[in-house]
Amino acid sequence: MSDSCPVAHEGNTQSTSESENPVIPSPTPAANRPRNNRDWWPNQPELSVLHAHTSKSNPMGEDFDYAEEFAKLDVEALKRDVIDLMTTSQDWWPADYGHYGGLFIRMSWHAAGTYRIADGRGGGGQGAQRFAPLNSWPDNANLDKARRLLWPVKQKYGKQISWADLLVFAGNCALESMGFKTFGFGFGREDIWEPEEMYWGPEDTWLGDERYSGDRELSGPLGAVQMGLIYVNPEGPNGQPDPLAAARDIRETFSRMAMNDVETAALIAGGHTFGKTHGAGDADLVGPEPEGAPIEQQGLGWKSAYGTGVGKDAITSGLEVVWTPTPTKWDNSFLEVLYGYEWELTKSPAGAWQWTAKDGAGAGTIPDPFDSSAGRAPTMLTTDLSLRIDPAYEKITRRWLDHPEEFAEEFAKAWYKLLHRDMGPVTRYLGPWVPEAQLWQDPVPAVDHQLIGDSEIAALKGKILDSGLSIPQLVSTAWASAATHRSTDMRGGANGARIRLAPQKDWEINSPAELSTILQTLEQIQQDFNSSQSGGVKVSLADVIVLAGAAAVEKAAKNAGHDVTVPFTPGRTDATQEQTDVESFAVLEPKADGFRNYLRAGEKLPAEALLVDRAYMLNLTAPEMTVLVGGLRALNANFGQTKHGVFTDRPEALTNDFFVNLLDMGTEWKGASSAENVYEGTDRVTGAAKWTATAVDLVFGSNSQLRALAEVYAADDAQQKFVQDFVSAWNKVMNLDRFDLD
């Protein structure tokens, strides 16, 4: 085989299509509909995200325990049923090569592949592919058929298996049914029952790419190149068939879902070892997506009028590619075909750019999916050729060509990571096939000692309060440790005490120099305690940090005249630097934390919007967000000890003064001339300076919904309720990552 460029560049490459599916029109928004509050006042904070997915939309009821129901499931029987389904072809959607494996792999990949590392959103952890917009994205065309094929299995096992688990488990079963040894599988994903409202991009049409600026700089936190795609356009950037340019898109988008070059190459080559794409004919004959389809189609979309519309006449992506001579068997044939031919640019019957083995080489070596007597020429996607043209991918895949066992191992690990990246630590996984924790799962050590009891807790609190550390220092450190948690992908939190490790110890928001001093004091308390104990009782630094915050809150409540006990459950452990992927953890660094009145320089989004997003990450309701902001201001816990929003003359006492003084009509607010994003409050009569604030503070008086909540806590009889609600919300945040307590 020649070592020269394997692709022929002759001919016109003007794209006639924008995307993987060039013919699916965008839905048309209703032009004349009643306006809602968001239409009239789009700049107000969107608080509804804090109250989504409540029991009101969940038919299972508040007492439903998925783990308990799953424990009753015969997982081996489930696997047999799913594998049997693979080769039971249905006339209404016939299986290519008599096997649905390729279809189910694509379904699982696309369910999990929406995950993005920047904010942890997306992924397969909630079964969101069942709902708009994902169920109707161009890249998910005809995956509605895959889900319908699975319905008899879901119907049989009912509440013992969630759709979220089944959608990704099916792909795992598909791989095993075709001879591949997977790395493992964890169940435990719970279904949502309404669409996830999240930012998928600025475009208002399918396949738009307004998300780019400059030299093809992709806007954060997005992980796909165009609206409605999972990753990249397989024809090449904006339909231009350039494998090297496509490699740039591939590297960027896959890295945004936490995949490196090896994992990326393994996923593409491994996934494309199976099945085919579908572009049999004129794609103008394909009907609307599921959400836009007529009611009589019962949620099935993309009905095609080309021929029979199914089987040999199916149109999905507009591409008509079969990668290997063995599309229902695991082997090394994808790489053998990729490197075994030179390639020339051609078009599918639907008009999409793809590549065919040059000069008729290999003609007849690729089987037809429905006619065993017919053969095809080898074909590839533009993005497949990227694995050969890009120097870094080429180095990886050429080695695999001669070392297929390494390829199989890397694909197994990458596939496992793809399906589980948004599930958090392995303590959340269910079932018998869970392998040992991987580095990307942010492992923490198991508890290997006796836990502290009430007497030890009381003694430690005393030592902490006598240490010379202030209430703001203790509160801020505990908050900084716990509030890294993201409910989107279950990462971060206080368990592991990673606040003392890189990169967290060096984040600006954590005031590294002061943090180091605080942690040294707390570590000394921990060491002194552990060395004085007998009977195997010990305490981790992670527990000491959280306990220190609890002690500080109790002292602040006492300063305000209230005796409270902040709940505390020991059992956290301390991770090591070796258990902490610095690059992976870097994405958890807050760009804003309104609870501490922190806003990183250069942020473009409004601070109050970022506060709501942070509250969403912490799984807080609007009332919980409100009481925490007010309480943390009273505790003087701002970043850098600024006085913005500290509306009290008795800081470090857990009072409702923030709300009382915010709602005081005797104060007039104006933007400060001396500082950006700061407001000055003056006496309405005398003009004397009273307070300073940020938008995060003032939004609780400006926004009507938040003001209504602030009024609850500003009332004369609200002090006790305020303290109780603050303690409850504080305890919730401290335990967000304690999945062992669920």
Swiss-Prot record:
InterPro entries: Catalase_peroxidase, Haem_peroxidase, Haem_peroxidase_sf, Peroxidases_AS, Peroxidases_heam-ligand_BS. The record marks R106 as: Transition state stabilizer. Residues 11-20 have a biased composition (Polar residues). There is a cross-link at W109-Y231 (Tryptophyl-tyrosyl-methioninium (Trp-Tyr) (with M-257)). Its EC number is 1.11.1.21. Its cofactor is heme b. GO terms for biological process: cellular response to hydrogen peroxide; hydrogen peroxide catabolic process. Keywords: Heme, Hydrogen peroxide, Iron, Metal-binding, Oxidoreductase, Peroxidase. Heme b binds at H272. The keyword tRNA processing does not apply. The keyword Metal-binding applies. There is a cross-link at Y231-M257 (Tryptophyl-tyrosyl-methioninium (Tyr-Met) (with W-109)). The active site is at H110 (proton acceptor). One of its GO terms (cellular component) is cytosol. HAMAP family: Catal_peroxid (MF_01961). This is Catalase-peroxidase. It comes from Rhodococcus jostii (strain RHA1). The gene is katG.
